UniProtKB/Swiss-Prot annotation:
UniProt keyword annotation of DNA-binding present: yes
Keyword terms: DNA replication, DNA-binding, DNA-directed DNA polymerase, Nucleotidyltransferase, Transferase, Viral DNA replication
UniProt name for this protein: Putative DNA polymerase 060R
Protein's UniProt keywords contain Nucleotidyltransferase: yes
């Protein structure tokens, strides 16, 4: 019998449960019995281990000889493999053995990983049950249509065919807030009063249901049927939630999805059930008939998913799929609100229903409009899921990474790498030692010295470019450079040996960054010394100038001219020094490296083998996609090749961490060193042997021009030939590839910052501009800023006057003919400490506020003592919090103000805000000294009070001065061209404000008369 497993589950008992769908898309529960989880103990004595575990029942110990994954820790080492009845016993036993002085390994590997590794089973995919599988007819554990009990030896990998469809329920809750203008916070009156659901069953039409409290304005059933949904009304919140639970129990979905369904809907539903004393009813909506799901709280962050913190239910047989973190990972949007996302990806718009409308609907019992809005929101989630093929992508990624699909939401990248490494090691005689188990020591003893260096290492090589516009540039990239280096040079935990070992390759180099051997650091110190001398000279000149009587005009002018020359030199040196400091960064490295790894012919490493399998798997998937005749296979193969690619590129990152599952900085620094060598060698060969000029080199890419190529076709063929010739110099699979595009115009501003126009071999161009690292690529700029930058860059690349396009845009800005969306700036808020938590901690324990450093904590403490007259206590901490918050970025201060107004701002939220205009002081003839942070407000707040507020157009223009002037100067335009325009506008605005003040209140304006000389 073949089944498609979509979830493995182990609660620590003596059986592992697999939830699967058959070819008819019905849910099947497979109860795998007889499997004994275990771990390795580093000792040669089975008796010593069994004596230490004499209080445990049914312990099995077997002596095995294995290699450590970390080769420096030994090979052919005696271990004892210890197995237990269940995972509960295994975890307790590992603690007992560690306290007894034994080193235990692979304690991280949970039973599901051990079983799927031992039997080569997919974590998401087809399995086959042997003839020994017994169908359970009575006293079933689950509510599945069919249930089987099978010994673990009777389960094997199934055929690789397209997966069946699954039953999906998409959800969206509408919740009241008893506090006006504040988000719901599970207060008594913050009731769930509406739940929209769409049920998607394979082969059937979608069923749309709206569960709602009783309302006065729902139309007749026939009208609702024309809209495409039915309404079920309930007298109170308890019965509504009970109805929702009954629906989930009857439908038995394999997937529950929604937009922010983990971050809000399920979390909030659970809180309301706890408040109403009915949490068990919700917890029993999974596939387990008698075992209620347990509440879990997760908190983690990654560069892909950002900060993740939520509570969820560990349902058996039901996978919660949240669309929000997936879209955050795959798309860089200004905003992740559902209306913006669907408009961008689907071209669909949400109904213009606000939070106030929702709260009003609850209060007035006029719920029809909000109900239709709720169902449409759920439909948008369904459309997003189908368009992005989210479920197929998750299952393919889970299969490649050897983890459950839900683990992709609840844990970061390292568990995926660990699972793949574990599976390979288990089959090939390695024991996975990692810092959390192999290095654990008994209580009272000092931990052993770490194998890994504490110092940093130098990263990828970037060639400092000469800013300017270049014609006909071709990009030549190394394909999967770091994975290819790991394969070619056999860089792995398992191949690290002492230098000079027969059959090994030795790498030796020096890393110098920000140390006395770094030429840039030497130059930085020289500039600092010169600036010190110039400061002394400037002080002397000022004293000399002040000592000269004003009547001696010529003598005084001579000294002033000399002083101005010194000040100009200072400014130039400070600019140069600042650029150097930016290059040097804060990291300091000063080391001589000497590392060796076994050659592939001697012994192929674990990581190179895994990477080879991943890259080969990707090639097979891409080939299968090209040959596929049906859309399902095409989609599956596309998602699979993407999963292989992401997983392969993540292997290097797992080694480079200082702390984690499998840190190995020796390997990471060797890979980056050889990567730098590859870039430099390729650039040298391209220049010396093929007549190419290197414009820019970055990590794994070279941007080159060839003067002898006169047409796009010649340049194209030349690039292909050069890439092939250079690739032959490097060991496979390292290869340089032409990216199949010509940059007809390439404007480079600095490292990782460039703009281009491209064409194909025939010279055909779409005219669309590409870019990287410039203002347009950053989401924390307003739409107007990006629009102004874009039209300026486009004009420069097309050799047109940028002011022809820029002037109308500036006119629209100043005359307020732009939409509010153009003025909105978005920025992500990290984690920061709320006031109540801050006050509870002591002043001495304060180092940072969540993710944010405090610029001058001592100054804030001194001011607090001055204000409160105390050195501690709640009042002191409350004042200190306000002063510390004033040192944080403006958008964080805005988030804190929003919380003070009763709004909810979760960590990782992207705030949408605008900059408001400061008030003008007519008496002092200047704008009041409001800081920028005080003038930030959310776009929603501005909409509500737009008649009393005004946007600060000058601020938006000011943010363009440096970027546009750099762009214009790089393209050969006059210096400070846009700065002059901005200065004119500032002066014009001051004159206008003075005139307004004079008309309104003439006595407040100081009239200065100038006498004729």
């Amino acid at each position: 019998m073949d089944l498609f497993v979509y979830q493995w589950f182990c609660d620590g008992s003596q059986e592992i449960r697999a939830y699967a769908v058959d070819s008819d898309s019905s849910t099947v529960c497979v109860r795998v019995t007889g499997f004994r989880p275990g771990f390795y103990v580093e000792t040669a004595s089975c008796q010593a281990v069994t004596r230490a575990l004499q209080d445990f029942r049914d312990v099995s110990a077997e002596k095995r000889v294995r290699d450590h994954l970390y080769a420096t820790r030994g090979s052919s080492v005696p271990f004892v493999w210890v197995t237990f009845r269940c995972w509960f016993d295994a975890r307790k036993a590992s603690d007992v053995l560690v306290k007894a002085g034994f080193a235990c390994h692979q304690c991280r590997a949970q039973p599901v990983l051990q079983l799927t590794s031992l039997r080569d089973l997919p974590t998401c995919g087809w399995i086959r049950l042997g003839k020994g599988a017994v169908q359970v007819k009575r006293e079933k554990y689950s509510r599945c249509k069919r249930e089987f009990i099978v010994q673990w030896e009777q389960v094997e990998r199934g055929p690789d065919v397209p997966q069946p469809e699954v039953t999906v329920v998409a959800l969206d809750l509408e919740v009241n807030s008893e506090v006006e203008n504040a988000m719901p916070k599970d207060r008594p009156g913050d009731e769930v009063f509406m739940a929209g659901a769409i049920i998607l069953r394979p082969g059937k039409k979608p069923k749309r249901v709206l569960l709602s409290l009783e309302a006065d304005d729902y139309p007749e059933a026939e009208v609702l049927a024309e809209r495409g949904y039915a309404v079920q009304q309930y007298p109170n919140e308890r019965s509504l939630i009970s109805g929702l639970c009954d629906m989930l129990s009857s439908v038995k979905p394999q997937v529950v999805t929604g937009y922010n369904v983990l971050g809000f809907d399920i979390d909030y539903l659970l809180k309301r059930c706890v408040r109403l004393g009915m949490e068990e009813e919700l917890c029993l909506t999974g596939m387990a008939a008698e075992r209620p799901a347990k509440e879990r709280t997760i908190s983690w962050s990654s560069s892909a998913f950002g900060a993740q913190k939520y509570s969820y239910l560990d349902w058996e047989g039901v996978v919660a799929v949240d669309l929000l973190p997936i879209i955050k990972r795959d798309y860089k949007f200004d905003s992740y609100r559902l209306d913006f996302v669907t408009e961008t990806l689907l071209g669909s718009n949400k109904d213009p229903v606000t939070a106030a409308d929702i709260f009003r609907a609850y209060a007035t019992r006029k719920m029809d409009v909000v109900g239709e809005y709720c169902v449409k929101d759920v439909q948008l989630c369904v459309d997003l899921m189908e368009k992005l093929q989210v479920w197929v992508g998750l299952t393919e990624m889970a299969k490649v990474c050897r983890v459950n699909a839900f683990t992709l939401f609840t844990q970061g990248q390292q568990i995926r790498i660990y699972s793949q490494v574990y599976c390979h090691c288990e089959k090939n005689g390695y024991v996975v030692t990692d810092p959390a188990d192999g290095k654990r020591v008994p209580w009272g003893q000092d931990p052993p010295v770490s194998d890994e260096p504490d110092e940093d290492y130098i990263g990828a090589h970037v060639v400092e470019p000469s800013p300017g516009i270049y014609d006909n540039v071709v990009p030549l990239d190394f394909s999967s450079l770091y994975p290819s280096i790991m394969i070619a040079k056999n860089v792995c935990y398992s191949t690290r040996v002492d230098p000079g070992t027969p059959g090994s390759e030795t790498f030796t180099w020096e890393d110098h960054l920000n140390c006395v051997h770094d030429p840039r650091k030497v130059e930085y110190e020289r500039l600092s010394s010169e600036l010190w001398d110039l400061d002394s000279e400037a002080r002397e000149l000022r004293r000399e100038r002040d000592a000269i009587p004003r009547k001696r005009v010529d003598d005084r002018r001579l000294v002033v001219d000399t002083l101005n020359t010194v000040l100009d030199a200072q400014r130039m040196l400070r600019t140069t020094r600042a650029a150097l400091k930016n290059q040097l960064g804060t990291k300091t490295v000063c080391a001589c490296r000497l590392l060796a790894f076994l050659e592939p012919a001697t012994k192929k490493g674990v990581m190179p083998t895994i990477l080879t399998d991943l890259l080969d798997g990707r090639k097979r998937a891409k080939k299968a996609k090209a040959e596929a005749k049906d859309s399902i296979t095409k989609i599956t193969m596309d998602k699979r090749q993407l999963a292989y690619k992401v997983s392969a590129n993540s292997m290097y990152g797992a080694m480079g961490v200082k702390r984690g599952y499998l840190p190995f900085q020796d390997g990471a620094m060797t890979v980056t060193y050889f990567g730098r060598q590859c870039i430099e060698k390729a650039a040298s060969i391209i220049g010396s042997e093929h007549g190419g000029q290197l414009v820019y080199g970055d990590t794994d890419s070279n941007y080159v021009t060839f003067a002898d190529a006169k047409t796009p076709a010649e340049l194209w063929d030349k690039a292909v030939a050069v890439a092939k010739a250079v690739s032959s110099v490097f060991p496979p699979p390292i290869s340089l590839e032409f990216e199949q595009v010509i940059y007809t115009k390439f404007l480079i501003l600095g490292k990782k910052r460039y703009i281009y126009l491209s064409c194909d071999r025939d010279g055909n161009s779409s005219g669309k501009m590409g870019f990287r690292g410039v203002l347009m690529a950053r989401r924390d700029n307003s739409g107007l800023a990006r629009k102004a930058y874009s039209i300026t860059a486009q004009a420069l690349l097309e050799d047109r006057d940028p002011w022809a396009d820029l002037t109308p845009l500036m006119k629209d800005m100043y005359t307020k003919n732009c939409s509010l969306r153009d003025f909105v700036i978005t920025k992500q808020v990290g984690s920061w400490c709320r006031e109540c938590a801050f006050i509870e901690q002591g002043a001495d324990s304060i180092v940072a506020v969540g993710d944010y450093k405090i610029r001058d904590l001592e100054k804030a403490k001194a001011e607090t003592r001055k204000i409160t007259g105390t050195d501690g206590g709640p009042e002191y901490m409350a004042v200190l919090y306000k002063l510390v918050m004033a040192q944080l970025p403006g958008h964080v201060q805005l988030a804190n103000r929003m919380i003070g107004r009763g709004e909810t701002v979760a960590d990782g939220t992207r705030l949408e805000y605008v900059v408001l205009r400061p008030s003008y002081d007519g008496k002092k003839r200047r704008f009041r000294g409001q800081g920028l942070s005080e003038r930030l407000e959310t776009s929603d707040y501005y909409k509500r009070f737009a008649e009393f507020l005004e946007l600060d157009t000058e601020h938006y223009v000011k943010t363009l001065v440096n970027p546009l002037d750099q762009l214009l100067t790089t393209a050969g335009r006059p210096e400070d061209e846009f700065k002059a325009f901005y200065g004119y506008r500032v002066n014009y605005r001051k004159v206008v404000e003075d005139i307004k003040t004079l008309r309104a209140c003439p006595e407040m304006v100081k009239i200065v008369s100038f006498k004729k000389k």
